[in-house]
């Protein structure tokens, strides 16, 4: 199953993305989601296949969501994931002596 997908980024939340089928555009995205997401900003288009690897999403789940509901919402990583990647020096910078 090959799908051409448009990916939009959220102007409100860093690293939040909305995947939609390019042919459908945003018409299948629920109205209630857009106030939370903000006005979608087109990032890029991508051909999705079951064999394709995505950095932070399960391709099977993305394709299932596109078929069943017409969109897939990629949430930003948890704050803890950001903190784990900071150098120890930055994590201790404001520690009391």
UniProtKB/Swiss-Prot annotation:
InterPro entries: YcgL-like_sf (IPR038068), YcgL_dom (IPR027354). It holds the Pfam family YcgL. This is YcgL domain-containing protein PP_4590. Transmembrane segments: none annotated. PROSITE patterns: YCGL (PS51648). Gene3D superfamilies: YcgL domain. Residues 3-87 form the YcgL domain.
